[in-house]
Amino acid sequence: MKKSTKKLCAIAALGTLFSSSLCLAAGPNANAASEGKWLSGDFHQHTLYTDGSTTFDFVMEKSNEFGLDWWANSEHGGGRNRDGNGVFWDTYIPNPILGNYAVSGGHQIMWRWQSLRDFVYPQILDTRSLYPERRAFSGFEWNVPGHEHCSTAIVAKDMAEDASAISAFEYQFDKSDKDTSRNSENTPYGTLTKTNVTHADAVTACQWMQDQYEDGGIDNAWIIFAHIERNGIAATGGYDVNDFRDFNNAGPDVAFGFEGAPGHQVNTFRGFGNALTCDENGVCISSEEDEPYDFGGTYGGVGYYTAEVGGLWDAMLGEGRRWFNFANSDYHKHYTAGGDDFYPGEYQKTWVYAVDKDGDGAYSYNEIADGMRSGNTYFAHGDLITHLEFEAQDNNRKASMGGELVADGAIKNLKIKITFKSPETNNCVADGTYISACAEPKVHHIDLIAGDITGLIDPEKEPEAYTDPTNPTTRVIATFAANSWETDKNGNNVIVYHLKDVDKSMYFRLRGTNLAPNTPDETDAVGNPLPDALVTRNQGIDGAQEAWNDLWFYSNPIFVYVK
């Protein structure tokens, strides 16, 4: 049986600050990174199987072309009427469709539990054969009961032939899957029960995945929530901070993060479908009367939950939660063909540090999934950086992203080391139509952001705190411009910063950009990102050009505990 952070949490029982932090820290990557390799990926993309506009094979080819080391086919649950080449299922002879009869667009649909198992997975196996150096995961975009969407994937026990686990998850828990034909079916994952209506059902789904992982029914999995601000608060179909806390409590080893930077980065609102309008004074409000301004568009291509210093993500981190941040393409249709998207890997990448645990010189699906869970990851726009090491050190104790450093008392001299590298060029191509000019990817400055860790919040004892999406202790404690770093013999930029007399538990995270503070309509006086809608309104710059002008990266946190 796998070591479960959930069981350790139960033992800690939300006691003191330190016992609470131990409960959350007992996962992978508790120390500095072991020998491994940085691998780039994208786990949210669409094909003709659902609402994408290009074939399955085309999207796999583009993922490879843009240099991704790994990716997941992750598209909507529910039911669809066509296959990955756009052929209607009911034109097959014989008709292969199983389950309850339903129609969409005049054609019979196939429920996703079947297409995932019987059609998509064989194509994933073909993809693995075609690109043996890459890793193509089996996943889907979960329509979360009571909420919006979520990227999921499972590494099955028998990867040569078995996609039944992801099929069982989709059938039971996807709110758009109305099929009832498999109710009471006995599977290796238990008896199937339809549980797909309420928030409580979504929590049960996370619990189910956690149980499968703990009990060895599956080798690995992730549940990472998608474009989290798009539908606003939970009352309008989105998410509140307490929802993420519930999911993480139920599945700490599988439900461990969200997409801080949504896909659809060529969209007018850099990923969101709801408008944010700004007046001549720069005051911005949502077009939806019942939603606050933070749900309209993005801030430097990043959602408000992540971009706001001291906001929702920082509230999660302030508990010491291993809750990590990722980015994807959410590719449906390329902007040059009338869509809102870059190809997978063309603009946004999630970088994962994978450890070669079995020493075979390759990186397995398990090792990549473990790397995501470890939190030793970061994401970047437009290849602003293609390498990042972020470490905290106290004497001989060291921790990297996602890890923890534990000190017996106050730390006299906490050493923060940042090592990063930018490429000479990225995938921007000036064509005179969509993009007039391309700047080299170059970091202007990096912010070191810190907040206090006060421990897990008990929803029964502190209900108001449990629903509070803020962390007022979070602040930018240092900003590093080009004169703050040196270049080593490998061409990496290196920053060393010392924090004296650390006498309380804190987390540290990074964000960096190619833009200077006070860049008109892009950043404020101290360098915080402004609403992307300002650039559209005031300068008329939109689409791909806006995205290539405005590049950011975000690290995941390091946790430092002082007893």
Model-derived features: where do they sit?
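Short, solvent-exposed beta-strand-terminating loops
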Residues: 77-83, 159-162, 260-279, 515-521
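Short, structured patches in soluble enzyme cores that scaffold and shape functional sites
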Residues: 227-229, 262, 356
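Bacterial N-terminal signal peptides
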Residues: 11-21
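Histidine/acidic residue-rich metal-binding segments in metalloenzymes
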Residues: 195-224, 237-254, 275-292, 304-320
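Bacterial N-terminal signal peptides that target proteins for export
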Residues: 2-11
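A metal-dependent hydrolase metal-coordination microenvironment
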Residues: 27-237, 307, 328, 519-520, ...
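C-terminal functional module detector
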Residues: 26-38, 46, 50, 56-60, ...
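Substrate-binding cleft/loops of secretory-pathway carbohydrate-active enzymes
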Residues: 145-163, 230-256, 333-353
